[in-house]
């Protein structure tokens, strides 16, 4: 059973309510463009540093509405199979590019390294021309013995496939690796820079871990996600050196236009704790 949240509403119900409210809000409202807060990361310009994390829009059906919410980037997924991916690609193709679109991928590991690698190659190949950036979701890695080596090995394997696709296609679609910072020993993140990735999406609400990740990754950008409740949390992550910040639960709790309020406060430097 889903854990209960604010007002006794569990996260699954809360997400469904937010999705319904989003569809209605964008039809009746005519929101002004959010303030311009351009940033540059992964070799691309973003209209602002605020993104929607994967897990809210699994298949891209809400892209147009989410772009009106003010996000500078929207991450679709997590997508695990070609069938799921093809459904999402149909929606992405109809989306007028406003926010950057990322596709969060997770190929199911098998006992056969070659088969696992081929699954990653298939997923990345299908998304190569559709997404602004790709995400290899390795956030399920835990802190068991050898996990640090496993994370690096997985990133190296995925990075090698990504590099091969770039050479074959004659183009570059940036690749980010998503991992849970609390399970990554000190010094491990620095090794990801040699794996051919363009950024790391670090899941953590711990300020010390976030600051350490920024130091270890430099010059690779950190995209921070996890535990963000309000605008002050976003400002704190950016001040700590994160290039981009993603939200999820706060969006479900605060409603469709929370991102616009947050960005307006970020632009003026007014960040009330507990508010937008």
What do the PLM-derived regions correspond to, one by one?
Residues 1-41:
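An N-cap/entry alpha-helix motif that binds or orients negatively charged groups
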Residues 22-35, 138-156, 179-220, 253-262:
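Glycine/Thr-rich beta-alpha phosphate-binding loop at enzyme active sites
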Residues 42, 51-63, 67-187:
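Active-site entrance/lid segments in N-terminal catalytic domains of soluble metabolic enzymes
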Residues 54-58, 229, 276:
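Short, glycine/acidic-rich beta->alpha junctions
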Residues 59-68, 118-122, 182-195, 212-222, ...:
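Catalytic cores of alpha/beta
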Residues 70, 74-82, 137-140, 198-206, ...:
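Glycine-rich phosphate-binding active-site loops on the catalytic face of alpha/beta enzymes
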Residues 103, 200, 269-270:
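Expand to "…catalyze enediolate/carbanion chemistry for C-C bond making/breaking, isomerization
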Residues 254-276:
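Short histidine
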């Amino acid at each position: 059973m889903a854990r209960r949240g604010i007002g006794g509403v569990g996260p699954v119900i809360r997400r469904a309510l937010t999705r319904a409210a989003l569809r209605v809000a964008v039809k009746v409202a005519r929101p002004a463009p959010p303030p311009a807060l351009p940033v540059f990361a992964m070799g691309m310009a973003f209209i602002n540093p605020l993104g929607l994390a994967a897990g809210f829009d699994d298949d891209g059906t809400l892209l147009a509405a989410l772009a009106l919410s003010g996000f500078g980037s929207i991450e679709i997924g997590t997508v695990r199979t070609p069938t799921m991916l093809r459904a999402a690609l149909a929606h992405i193709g109809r989306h007028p590019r406003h926010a950057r679109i990322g596709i969060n991928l997770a190929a199911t590991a098998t006992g056969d390294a070659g088969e696992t690698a081929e699954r990653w190659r298939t997923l990345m190949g299908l998304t190569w021309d559709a997404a602004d950036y790709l995400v290899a979701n390795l956030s399920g890695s835990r802190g068991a013995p050898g996990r640090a080596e496993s994370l690096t090995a997985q990133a190296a394997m995925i990075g090698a496939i990504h590099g091969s696709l770039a050479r074959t296609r004659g183009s570059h679609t940036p690749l980010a690796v998503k991992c849970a910072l609390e399970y990554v020993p000190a010094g491990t993140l620095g090794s990801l820079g040699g794996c051919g990735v363009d950024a790391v999406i670090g899941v953590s609400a711990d300020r010390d871990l976030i600051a350490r990740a920024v130091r270890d990754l430099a010059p690779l950008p950190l995209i921070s996600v996890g535990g963000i409740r309000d605008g002050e949390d976003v400002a704190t992550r950016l001040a700590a050196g994160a290039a981009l910040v993603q939200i999820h639960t706060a969006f479900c709790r605060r409603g469709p236009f929370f991102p616009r309020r947050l960005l307006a406060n970020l632009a003026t430097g007014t960040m009330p704790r507990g508010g937008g």
